Amino acid sequence: MEVISVKHKADIIKGEYQFADKVKSEVLSLLKVCNPISQDNSNVKASIHTEWDWEPDNITFRNLKSYIREEIERYCKPGAMSGGGRNMLKVGNFWANVYNKGDYAQSHCHKPNDFSFAYFVKSKWYYSPLAFTDSGKKIIPKEGTFVAFPGYQGICTHSS
């Protein structure tokens, strides 16, 4: 048997969230009291990495996750089955990373998740972009913007 790697086209969704100010306020407030996890065995080398299922009952975050999930459902229609039905997406994990100068994320993917997303809470135009390793496409971070993508897509951020 032979395994052959191929590059393929994959769509990503980039959009703005109308309640970005509320999300920013909530995130910045909660980061002050969060319990960061160790990054020893992680691809993410950020100044802060919250726990994997951060604030699951927070209504502001639940609304953000629901909105992005609905946008993925609308534009990508994942989970389609041959009989015409669909399995709806679920948001399994939700965490925050704080990247300071010199921080980065090594190339990684979010398999086995069908989709994943990044949401930029606080950003400047010169911050490191979210880079898709297969295509080389880079997304410049902008406050209040999300980027949703298939979980198998390789992503990274370079140190700034």
Predicted regions and their residues:
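Catalytic core of non-heme Fe(II) oxygenases with the double-stranded beta-helix
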Residues: 81-159
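Non-heme Fe(II)/2-oxoglutarate
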Residues: 1-87
